[in-house]
Amino acid sequence: MALSVYYDKDIDLGVIQSLQVGIIGYGTQGEAQALNLRDSKVKVRVGLYQGSLSIPKAKAEGFEVLEVKELVQKSDVIMALLPDELHKEVLEKEVIPFLKEGQIVGFAHGFSVHFNQVSFKKGVGVILVAPKGPGSALREEYLKNKGLYHLIAIEQENSKNNAKAVALSYAKAMGGGRMGVLETSFKEECESDLFGEQAVLCGGLEAVVRMGFETLIKAGYPEELAYFECVHEVKLVADLLHYKGVEGLRKHISNTAEFGAIKAREPMENLLEKRMQKILKKIQNGSFAKDFLLEKSLNYPRLNTERKALKETKIEQVGEILRTPFNHEK
């Protein structure tokens, strides 16, 4: 099923320019979105809790900073750009009680809405505007007169029946219309995003990289060569895949590499298929969300342990040395 795609020519920027936008949070996404919106001549304020370390930065960049509940009362569109696990706590206390019909609450990821962490009264719009990339890339591409792909979705219409128009206009203001704005649903965005992170982009890639590195080390190969072959060159291949696709990647590698990839892929696919299906199932049935929210409630014991342990791994120790020349170049 093909998704509807919208470009700059299809979208009215004036819709969002006529409204007051409030950005809750000033991390990498909050900052990038606020700056892009302002450069697109959209009226923007930032909402932060009293004492937030981000207040000086937001003010230095010229934004009016309000406490969250005041921001909500002075905005037409409120974007919740906080970590997923904080949405329930912050929104139930500082946002939802102060909302009125006609307002719109937006998210950059569908997690808290799809997994029923928050809900909104009738007449309040609930939208998704999700840039397909980190805040740093969102800002960099905008400044180059380019953009990132964006996803939009409407979970709940507002009393003005303009939720979709607002979502599209907001995405255009961030540069999304330069590449393409795709319409989906909170469910599809949330579940596919989590799956991509876990099975491929973060969890899957890290597992393959670390296992490859360890396999060569245990077989007696030099650590430096293991790092170059299994970690460093990932970027070269990823760039080819990004810009040219799978077929294009194949065309840019040797016959030896291509034949070897085909031979190695077949047994790996058999192992991965069932594992990936299990990962997706745990996302779909809410098991992952439950585990993650429990982790947050316990103050992140697993994350803290894993982060500490990672610093002591051989792959990180070798990588820190080999990455130094590249860091110097920057």
Swiss-Prot record:
GO cellular component terms given for this protein: cytosol
Any one Gene Ontology molecular-function term assigned to this protein's record: ketol-acid reductoisomerase activity
Catalytic residues (UniProt): 109
Names of the cofactor(s): Mg(2+)
PROSITE patterns linked to this entry: KARI_C, KARI_N
Reactions catalysed according to its record: (2R)-2,3-dihydroxy-3-methylbutanoate + NADP(+) = (2S)-2-acetolactate + NADPH + H(+); (2R,3R)-2,3-dihydroxy-3-methylpentanoate + NADP(+) = (S)-2-ethyl-2-hydroxy-3-oxobutanoate + NADPH + H(+)
Residues where Mg(2+) 2 binds: 193, 229, 233
Keyword Metal-binding assigned: yes
Binding site for substrate: 254
Tree of life domain: Bacteria
Binding site for NADP(+): 26-29, 52, 54, 135
Cofactor note: Binds 2 magnesium ions per subunit.
Enzyme Commission number, as recorded: 1.1.1.86
Protein residues bound to Mg(2+) 1: 193, 197
UniProt domain KARI C-terminal knotted: residue ranges: 185-329
Record domain KARI N-terminal Rossmann: where: 3-184
Top-level EC class as recorded in UniProt: oxidoreductase
GO biological process, one term: L-valine biosynthetic process
Pathway(s) where this gene product acts: Amino-acid biosynthesis; L-isoleucine biosynthesis; L-isoleucine from 2-oxobutanoate: step 2/4; Amino-acid biosynthesis; L-valine biosynthesis; L-valine from pyruvate: step 2/4
Role played: Involved in the biosynthesis of branched-chain amino acids (BCAA). Catalyzes an alkyl-migration followed by a ketol-acid reduction of (S)-2-acetolactate (S2AL) to yield (R)-2,3-dihydroxy-isovalerate. In the isomerase reaction, S2AL is rearranged via a Mg-dependent methyl migration to produce 3-hydroxy-3-methyl-2-ketobutyrate (HMKB). In the reductase reaction, this 2-ketoacid undergoes a metal-dependent reduction by NADPH to yield (R)-2,3-dihydroxy-isovalerate.
Family according to the record: Belongs to the ketol-acid reductoisomerase family.
HAMAP family: IlvC (MF_00435)
Protein name, as recorded: Ketol-acid reductoisomerase (NADP(+))
